[in-house]
């Protein structure tokens, strides 16, 4: 048993091919979970009464207010909540609020230029692309400085 734990701690078993394989398996599981989550939702509201994309709804609502020429209303909680509800046809949704600086309206107005589901997809894809870019940069840096550090 000691040999097993030593092998696990060393990290030698985790090859690049295994890391890619495990990552793809995890990605497939997440894709299935998201598909199931969307399948059991009621329109754009999940089973818990929250919007799909939860706090993205505040970004989309603020962008909608900006398109209507009323961006300052995003900083008024009651008006922002009303805008969040309006995104979902007036249904009761949790209040997420707008806590971003004014320059973030530039992002909000872009995602609010399309229907909510498309805006959410764009938001998630852009976030994931940024995540991958950072992970790639970290990976390159760690390859240059590869040092064995036992646990």
Regions found by a protein language model. Name each.
Residues 8-10, 14-17, 27, 31-138:
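TM-lumen/periplasm interface segments of multi-pass membrane proteins
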Residues 22-25:
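Sec-dependent N-terminal signal peptides
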């Amino acid at each position: 048993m000691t040999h097993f734990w030593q092998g696990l701690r060393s990290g030698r078993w985790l090859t690049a091919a295994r890391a890619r394989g495990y990552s793809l398996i995890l990605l497939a599981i997440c894709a299935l979970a998201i598909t199931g989550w969307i399948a059991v939702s009621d329109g754009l509201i999940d089973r818990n009464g929250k919007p799909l994309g939860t706090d993205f709804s505040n970004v989309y609502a603020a962008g909608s207010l900006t398109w209507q020429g009323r961006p300052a209303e995003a900083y008024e909680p009651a008006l922002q909540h009303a805008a969040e509800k309006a995104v979902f046809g007036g249904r009761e949704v949790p209040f997420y609020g707008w806590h971003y600086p004014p320059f973030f309206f530039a992002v909000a107005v872009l995602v609010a230029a399309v229907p909510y589901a498309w805006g959410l997809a764009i938001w998630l894809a852009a976030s994931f692309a940024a995540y991958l870019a950072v992970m790639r940069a970290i990976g390159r840096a760690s390859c240059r400085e590869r040092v064995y550090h036992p646990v």
